[in-house]
Amino acid sequence: MPHNKSFQTHKSFKDLIDKYEGFILDQFGVLHNGVCGLEGAPELVKELRDTYQKKLVILSNTSSSSASCKAKLPSLGFDPKYFENAVTSGQEAGNHIHETFAPSRKKALWFTWKTKDILSPLRFLELCGEEVPLTTDPSE
């Protein structure tokens, strides 16, 4: 079987530090498990910033906003100041809806699951650039 040189295995993250100016780090399963930082992750993040001055960005498929994602970091053992930004699917969806549909003034219906971390539907639609009428009249 031919050797695929596009993939390399490294014994330590430190093998990669000098090769890149920054890192995009997936949130769940790489940085934390939803309850606390994974073993060594908070220390590595601190070292990447303080010792090596690397730029760090969080990537997450959460439906929450980037701000909400960063606000949870302290409870997971991370200092938010170490991250340039957080890119979340929720934030990107809101941006896309705003850019694509807000000018048309079309109505929207949002389906999601209930969780303490999710934005309220009204707040999410406001982030999408929608004026939110406070009515549930189905005739509208």
Language-model-detected regions and their locations in the chain:
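HAD-like aspartate-dependent phosphatase fold
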Residues: 1-140
